């Protein structure tokens, strides 16, 4: 049975809830949740097209010496054979997404983004 995000927020930390919500959005864009990888080990064989993402840092806002707006930044990479994929625009359209760069490596096009939640 799938849990709603509300149920998940009662089970996981705020950061993990944000990550799981992002994972769902990325899986929806890719159309295949099994090819969305969070911090995969280097020796793992990936299936393409794929989205790989890592925690890239964060920032916090404070008022009266109390943290009230924690943010997590994710480094997201779309890896596929198509250099002009519509998936690039779909990821760019996500809330707080910034397109960083793209390059070709080993015959695969890699598009890098930063997404803050």
PLM features per residue range, with description:
Residues 1-60, 66:
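Small/polar-rich, solvent-exposed N-terminal microdomains that initiate assembly or binding
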Residues 36-37, 85, 112:
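Signature of extracytoplasmic/envelope-associated structural regions
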Residues 46, 67-71, 106-108:
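Short coil/turn motifs at beta-sheet boundaries
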Residues 61-64, 76-80, 99-103:
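Glycine-rich loops and low-complexity Gly/Arg-rich segments
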Residues 62-65, 87-89:
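Short, charged, solvent-exposed linker or helix-capping segments at domain edges/interfaces
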Residues 70-81, 109-117:
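Oligomerization/assembly interface segments of phage tail-like spikes and tubes
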Residues 73-97:
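Short cationic/low-complexity microdomains
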Residues 89-117:
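Acidic-leaning, charged glycine-interspersed low-complexity segments
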């Amino acid at each position: 049975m799938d849990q709603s995000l509300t149920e998940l927020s009662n089970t996981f930390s705020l950061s993990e809830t944000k990550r799981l919500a992002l994972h769902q959005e990325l899986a929806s864009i890719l159309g295949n949740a099994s090819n969305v990888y969070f911090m995969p080990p280097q020796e793992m064989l990936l299936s393409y097209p794929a989205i790989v993402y890592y925690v890239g840092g964060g920032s916090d806002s404070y008022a009266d010496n109390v943290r009230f707006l924690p943010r997590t930044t994710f480094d997201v990479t779309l890896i596929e054979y198509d250099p002009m994929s519509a998936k690039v625009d779909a990821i760019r359209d996500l809330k707080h997404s910034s397109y960083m760069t793209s390059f070709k490596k080993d015959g695969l096009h890699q598009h890098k983004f930063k997404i803050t939640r």
